[in-house]
Amino acid sequence: MSGERRLNGLSLKVGPLGEHDRLLTLLSDQEGVTRLAVPGARRPRSSLAAAVPLSLLELQVAGRRGLARVRQLKVLRSFNSVGKQLETLAAAQALAELSLMLVAGNDPLPGLLNTLLMHLERLEALSQAQPAQPNTTLACSVQACVHLLALGGYGLPVQECCRNGTALEPPLGQWEWRCSLMPEEGFAIGALPGAALQLNPSELALLQRLLRPDLPMRRDGELMGPPEVWLRLLAVVECWTRTHLPHHMRALGMLRKAIISSGDGRT
């Protein structure tokens, strides 16, 4: 069959297609986001039944016009263990949803797949932590969104004031100082009318540190920031994505509810 090719990528979304097939949405370095038919995947004992969400797959695909079909499938890695905890499941779903929004069709976004896999690995480890660590899960999720948004060209502009270009240098210890999130513009120094929310110096400093590869930790190895601060930073991400991306991210709301229900977050 024409158009035979191999694809390696992460299954972002899987849904029914007809009576026996599945529709697979795959993120790959080669093709960006690709939608594929997986014939017979809903039949019992099908060799293609492993086409499930959040799995790293190696596929043999046939056809380039219309909906290509999966001929062979091999699971390289599964992240289904994130479902052990509601918080890590909601976080993983949010990252998959965000990645899907950031890629324009078949136009690959360099670095997105590897970054997404890195953060899913962190969530996978957290899903197995005993006792559960919902605040760390929340922090990982916020940082992952910050990283993915930056890769997709929607990075949070946390380095300078959107009104006058002054460097955003939070004066730690000056608790009366504020910066305002203006949804269409970015962050502005001062408590301004029309702001979606305001951050104090320590909250802004924490947000700025999320651009680094690792989570901000104290010298004793504990995560910086209490749950209520991480919920505020989640609100920043929610506001920014709602304003600048084409669709509302429902999974972020699910994550917020899961964190609050866990007792490790406060409104």
Swiss-Prot record:
Annotated TM spans:
none
Q: Which UniProt keywords apply?
A: DNA damage, DNA recombination, DNA repair
Question: Which Pfam families does this chain map to?
Answer: RecO_C, RecO_N
Report which residue ranges the record marks as coiled coil. none
Which GO cellular component does the record give, naming just one?
Answer: bacterial nucleoid
What the entry lists under InterPro entries is as follows:
ARFGAP/RecO (IPR037278), DNA_rep/recomb_RecO_N (IPR022572), NA-bd_OB-fold (IPR012340), RecO (IPR003717), RecO_C (IPR042242)
Q: Which GO terms describe its biological process?
A: DNA recombination; double-strand break repair
Q: What exactly does this protein do? A: Involved in DNA repair and RecF pathway recombination.
The record's annotation in HAMAP family points to: RecO
The family note in this entry says: Belongs to the RecO family.
**Protein name (record):** DNA repair protein RecO
Q: Which organism is it from?
A: Prochlorococcus marinus (strain MIT 9313)
